[in-house]
A protein has these predicted regions:
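A short, polar/charged loop/turn motif at coil->beta-strand junctions and beta-hairpin connectors
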Residues: 4-7, 76, 154
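Short linear sequence motifs
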Residues: 43-46, 78, 87, 155
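Non-heme Fe(II)/2-oxoglutarate
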Residues: 1-71
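Catalytic core of non-heme Fe(II) oxygenases with the double-stranded beta-helix
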Residues: 87-146, 154-158, 163-165
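A short coil-to-beta-strand element that immediately follows conserved catalytic motifs
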Residues: 72-81
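Conserved active-site beta-strand element of glycosyltransferases/polysaccharide synthases
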Residues: 84
């Protein structure tokens, strides 16, 4: 495994996708959410979410070799989960289920900075702001992660989830 990830539980990946592609994916997802009247998310009240939107599944599979390279171990794609956060939303501190062993949170569109916090193995917490197309790859089952109350209007992001191959 990549030593940096092992020592910090995460790695910041600037421009994981081009900002233009991030904006286009956000536009497509927001249109989908509106067209199909996607309702509130169960984990984050007053946000909208959807699992395995086709544009994100394509990205999940396309990026598997790159994620494998960053991690230094072969990964298998499991699923995607996208969420549209609204003013006042927060993501409580948690770890993920086994299908999210290696996860990326990818920023697609925002109107306000909103760091994701990750707890490192030494107990230190680090907050990272992402721009459109930037990602954080982290060990979802090991690293507690969260977001404090969102002060903007809208924040669109997608999680890309993987597991390590045997």
């Amino acid at each position: 495994m990549n030593q940096y990830i092992e020592n910090s539980n995460f790695i910041y990946i600037p421009k994981f996708i081009f900002p233009e592609r991030a904006n286009q994916l956000a536009k497509e997802f927001l249109e989908f959410v509106e067209k199909y009247d996607i309702k509130d998310d169960v984990q984050v009240e007053n946000s909208q979410s959807y699992q395995n939107f086709v544009g994100f599944l394509e990205l999940l599979c396309e990026k598997t070799p790159e994620v494998t390279k960053f991690l230094g171990e072969t990964v298998l794609p499991t699923y995607t989960y996208a969420r549209v956060y609204k003013n006042g939303n927060e993501l409580t501190r948690h770890t993920d289920r086994h299908a999210c062993e290696v996860s990326l949170t990818l920023q697609l569109k925002k109107d306000h900075d909103w760091p994701i916090y990750i707890k490192k193995p030494n107990g230190e917490s680090v907050g990272i702001d992402l721009d459109s197309g930037d990602a954080i790859m982290y060990l979802g089952c090991e690293a507690e992660h969260w977001r404090e109350k969102f002060e903007g209007t809208e924040y669109v992001q997608v999680f890309l989830h993987y597991v390590r191959s045997r």
